[in-house]
Regions:
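Conserved short histidine dyad/triad with adjacent acidic residue
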Residues: 38, 53-68
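Short, charged/polar surface micro-motifs in flexible loops or helix N-caps
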Residues: 48-50, 58-61, 81, 125-128
Length: 137
């Protein structure tokens, strides 16, 4: 007997982070926030153990150099490319690639290009509230 397929969609503002039921999540129904100068983030998953955020970074934008005491992060580039400085080393990360940042590692992500960048930030545990700003390298 074939298995039934059900649609798993959510209405805007459905609170994906707090739901125990599976459903499709996107920017359209995720919690949105602004950061930096003209940068956007959407919480696709947000719970006490894991954070998955889709972020948009316009040309020339950069975050403040910082580190996280507890959170490890993985940045996966969906489109465009970013320059990631970690521990004083610069790494160009193009679309289809990612970079892992371990807890305690000073880092900064920048978009030095003339095109916008979309990327995922996966943090475990979540990095919000676990950020310590540091001077530029």
């Amino acid at each position: 007997m074939p298995k039934r397929t059900k649609s798993v969609t959510a209405k805007a503002g459905a609170g994906a982070a707090n739901s125990n039921q599976p459903f499709a999540i996107s920017r359209e129904n995720a919690e949105h926030y602004r950061w930096g100068v003209d940068c956007d983030g959407w919480h696709l998953v947000r719970d006490k153990n894991l954070s998955v955020i889709e972020e948009f970074m316009p040309p020339g934008a950069a975050e403040i150099r910082h580190y996280h005491e507890h959170a490890q992060q993985f940045f996966y580039i969906l489109s465009g490319e970013v320059l990631v400085e970690a521990n004083g080393e610069n790494t160009l990360v193009p679309a289809g690639s990612g970079i892992r940042i371990l807890p305690g590692t000073p880092h900064q992500i920048r978009n030095p290009t003339s095109s916008a960048v979309h990327f995922l930030v996966i943090s475990q545990p979540p990095s919000h509230g676990d950020r310590i700003d540091v001077p530029p390298a």
